[in-house]
Design a protein with these regions (language model features):
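Exposed loop/turn and edge beta-strand positions of beta-sandwich/beta-sheet ligand-binding modules
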Residues: 38, 70, 106
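Core segments of cupin and vicinal oxygen chelate
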Residues: 7-51
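Vicinal oxygen chelate
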Residues: 2, 29-32, 76, 82-132
Length: 132
């Protein structure tokens, strides 16, 4: 067994793809329209087809979702957290907790929201691989 992907529903697929590729460096691996079901799936990731993906689901007749109160956040390692937060503001994301040390620690983190208001934690990984 292994983890394959996580899926989030988005209201504007192009805006979401731009956010995750230009800010967080994911690559669009494949995008498929399903006209009979009136939805599009886009799979983004850092590696090849054997690595986990972020699946963006765009339902053609829905542009806004109620995220509820159960969703926590996704976390991404970034080389320069300050530059990432600047880019997020440019791409209509929202920095909700500016970069700084985490409580009771020294790791520099920030919390942002993507164009659909999904919460994303950024963890600065200077001098290291941005991943774990």
């Amino acid at each position: 067994m292994r983890f394959l992907h996580t899926m989030i529903r988005v209201g504007d697929l192009d805006k979401s793809i731009k956010f995750y590729t230009e800010v967080l460096g994911l690559k669009l691996h494949r995008q498929t329209d399903y006209p009979d079901g009136k939805f599009t799936l886009a799979f983004l990731g850092y590696g090849g087809d054997t690595e986990p993906f972020l699946e963006l689901t765009y339902n053609w007749d829905t542009d806004k979702y109620d995220l509820g109160n159960a969703y926590g956040h996704m976390a991404f390692g970034v080389e320069d957290i300050y530059a990432a937060c600047e880019k997020i503001n440019e791409l209509e994301g929202k920095v909700v907790r500016p970069p700084g040390p985490m409580k009771h620690g020294t790791t520099v983190i920030a919390f942002v929201e993507d164009p659909d208001s999904y919460r994303v934690e950024l963890i600065e990984r200077k001098g290291k691989s941005a991943g774990y």
